Amino acid sequence: MGTPSVSEASALLSSGGGPLLLPKQKGAKLYCSHRHGRRLRTSGAHRNCRSRSRRSGADFRTRTSLSRRSRLILYAGSLVPRELTECAKAGATIRSSASMTLEEQFALMKEFYDRGQLVVRLHTGDPCIYGAIQEQMNFFDQYGMHYHITPGISSFQAAAAALQSQFTIPERVQTIILTRGEGRTPMPEKEKLSLLARSQSTMCIFLSAGVVDQVQRELLEHYPPTTPVAACYHLTWKDERIFRGQLQDLAKIVNENHLTLTTMIVVGDTIDNREGLSRLYSHQFKHLFRK
């Protein structure tokens, strides 16, 4: 709490040590792509349009956000609450990309970019993890549109905080797997859940509430039935809900509570674990800062 994050450090580096357009804040995480001069920049944005949001560890003297300065806000309407665009300046164009094709999105962004106007592209979580931004970068590269991506907080990280759990345990679990269940998009054969489950690592499963029965079957091939699980719905949203249980009941938990694709499934003994001490602060452990 109050510890500078990777996103904050990246933003400070990008600004050359100057004031931040958007201070570090705590809430639902988004990403903004915007053009400044002849450059498209991407930086972390949060649920900050209204003062009801919680904030921590930041200097709020600079209150101007990217969204308040933009002429176009193109947000992922299927994942981003409309209320997060309410801080836009009067007269700004606000569009949901949910019903748009890629070509329509590109044409709209380039139209504003070519006018020299600020463009904001809102994504949830970290856009580099299941963010579908590769095709956008291809487009920007094709037309020589410069851009910058600032890392942010993914839903698996938000899940760890909401669960108040450390996803690694000294000498027991040192691996975190980010993956998804097989749906309409096939999984590579070597990345099947049943294969990944062999390590019994902490597994964070994206986009898989709709195939939870299959997910449970594959995980049970290697994880014990009593392995702790958590189904985390709408993490960081106002209607966030978290359901804990055991792996043998995962499908029941998800189905009975009508959880949707915006659910992060976490599996592993690290959930609610309070055993195992790190050697980092042991009086017997010597390192650069303590000899």
What feature does the model see in each segment?
Residues 77, 98, 151-153, 182, ...:
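Residues at the C-termini of beta-strands that transition into short coil/loop
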Residues 79-81, 128, 155, 211, ...:
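Alpha-helix capping/helix-boundary segments
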Residues 6, 19-150:
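Class I S-adenosyl-L-methionine
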Residues 55, 126-199, 241-244:
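Class I SAM-dependent methyltransferase SAM-binding "motif I" and its flanking Rossmann-like core
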Residues 2-11:
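Extreme N-terminal basic, low-complexity initiation segments
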Residues 12-13, 17-18, 24-48, 104, ...:
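A contiguous loop/helix-start segment that scaffolds small-molecule binding in enzyme catalytic cores
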